[in-house]
């Protein structure tokens, strides 16, 4: 069994990597990928904590987080496709200059 600290450290590292991707990257697709990494890091923390205390609640929360991430990804990708069709660009600085 993996110790609690190792799993939580891995989840924290993944969360920081995702947060870095969201804050530093200017491309909306990479920002969406960073957000997905952050959601998966939180889900990993739930599984590790549930495994440590011998409860199935962590796995239930993992399923909930994955379904939330799937819904967020599908809506986000649909919006990105529409944005790319209209502006031919996914750079957040260029998109913020759109009129309307």
Swiss-Prot record:
It is a multi-pass membrane protein. One of its GO terms (cellular component) is plasma membrane. This is NADH-quinone oxidoreductase subunit K. It is found in: Cell inner membrane. NDH-1 shuttles electrons from NADH, via FMN and iron-sulfur (Fe-S) centers, to quinones in the respiratory chain. The immediate electron acceptor for the enzyme in this species is believed to be ubiquinone. Couples the redox reaction to proton translocation (for every two electrons transferred, four hydrogen ions are translocated across the cytoplasmic membrane), and thus conserves the redox energy in a proton gradient. The keyword Cell membrane applies. Its EC number is 7.1.1.-. It catalyses: a quinone + NADH + 5 H(+)(in) = a quinol + NAD(+) + 4 H(+)(out). One of its GO terms (biological process) is ATP synthesis coupled electron transport. PANTHER family: NADH-UBIQUINONE OXIDOREDUCTASE CHAIN 4L (PTHR11434:SF16), NADH-UBIQUINONE OXIDOREDUCTASE SUBUNIT ND4L (PTHR11434). Belongs to the complex I subunit 4L family. The lineage of its organism: Bacteria, Pseudomonadati, Pseudomonadota, Gammaproteobacteria, Enterobacterales. The keyword Cell membrane applies. GO terms for molecular function: NADH:ubiquinone reductase (non-electrogenic) activity; quinone binding. Keywords: Cell inner membrane, Cell membrane, Membrane, NAD, Quinone, Translocase, Transmembrane, Transmembrane helix, Transport, Ubiquinone. The chain crosses the membrane at residues 2-22, 28-48, 60-80. It comes from Erwinia tasmaniensis (strain DSM 17950 / CFBP 7177 / CIP 109463 / NCPPB 4357 / Et1/99). NDH-1 is composed of 13 different subunits. Subunits NuoA, H, J, K, L, M, N constitute the membrane sector of the complex.
